[in-house]
């Protein structure tokens, strides 16, 4: 596992979100493999509520597993960067498959999850850009699309963040595109 290489690779990985799933899958696997990280799409098991998991296969190899739960591009990319945070910042302490229901009262667990969520959010949408957009936008589709283009992400990623922060999932659902991944 090459931590410094992975840190440097994050902007390249982020750019892949603009491609179609069939176009970015092989490139994503290749970029991550250069850093000692494998990625696999695994089936979603009903009622587990798991979008992703991270585990260390050896001292030099990490496996990130993503499920097709919710099947939307914003959740897929958010989950990828969430798991990459566990790899970069939390190390080999434990595998990071988290059943929220089992751990929501565990302060240490929640701190790691909150940190990974923040990392994913801020990697996809830079905080200063987000703050300016959110403060000054009337949240029209055209504004969302233009903002997404400006920061180099798909509109669905911005719509997903807006949905999560406002609780208005239906309002932005048209921009949140579904993805199909082969498991």
Residue ranges of each PLM-predicted region?
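Active-site hotspot residues in diverse enzymes, especially metal/ion-binding acidic/histidine motifs
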Residues: 1-183
């Amino acid at each position: 596992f090459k931590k410094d290489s992975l840190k440097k690779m994050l902007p390249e990985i982020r750019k892949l979100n603009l491609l179609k799933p069939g176009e970015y899958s092989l490139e994503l696997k290749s970029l991550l493999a250069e850093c000692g990280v494998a990625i696999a799409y695994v089936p979603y098991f009903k009622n587990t509520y798991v979008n992703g998991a991270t585990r260390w296969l050896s001292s030099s190899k990490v496996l990130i597993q993503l499920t097709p739960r919710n099947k939307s591009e914003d959740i897929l990319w958010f989950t990828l960067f969430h798991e990459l945070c566990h790899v970069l910042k939390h190390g080999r302490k434990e595998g990071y498959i988290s059943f929220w229901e089992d751990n929501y009262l565990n302060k240490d667990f929640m701190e790691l999850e909150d940190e990974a969520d923040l990392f994913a959010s801020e990697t996809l949408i830079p905080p200063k850009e987000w703050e300016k957009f959110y403060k000054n936008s009337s949240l029209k589709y055209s504004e969302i699309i233009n903002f997404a283009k400006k920061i180099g992400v798909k509109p669905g990623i911005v719509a997903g963040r807006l949905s999560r922060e406002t609780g208005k999932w239906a309002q932005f659902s048209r921009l949140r595109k579904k993805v199909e991944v082969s498991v």
